[in-house]
Amino acid sequence: MSDIADRVKKIVVEHLGVEEEKVTENASFIDDLGADSLDTVELVMAFEEEFGIEIPDDAAETIQTFGDAVKFISEAA
């Protein structure tokens, strides 16, 4: 797993209190990991802070899974 993926996974595990094994590429933050809309906003803010990037609102709405987050951050960082 890439450094970006490792860092994203750590943020997801810490913010959502889920087991690391549940955070897979296609794991939906809401459907699979139990996040609500506030959790997803907090995740986006944590990604922005961790990676020093800005995620516009329209892009944030497309980040629904762990894989989406890793892909977006990899392209933006």
UniProtKB/Swiss-Prot annotation:
Location relative to the cell: Cytoplasm
A biological-process GO annotation: lipid A biosynthetic process
Post-translation changes: 4'-phosphopantetheine is transferred from CoA to a specific serine of apo-ACP by AcpS. This modification is essential for activity because fatty acids are bound in thioester linkage to the sulfhydryl of the prosthetic group.
Cited function: Carrier of the growing fatty acid chain in fatty acid biosynthesis.
Principal location: cytoplasm
Protein name (Swiss-Prot/TrEMBL): Acyl carrier protein
GO molecular function: acyl binding; acyl carrier activity
Pathway(s) this gene product operates in, as recorded in its UniProt entry: Lipid metabolism; fatty acid biosynthesis
Tagged with keyword Chloroplast: no
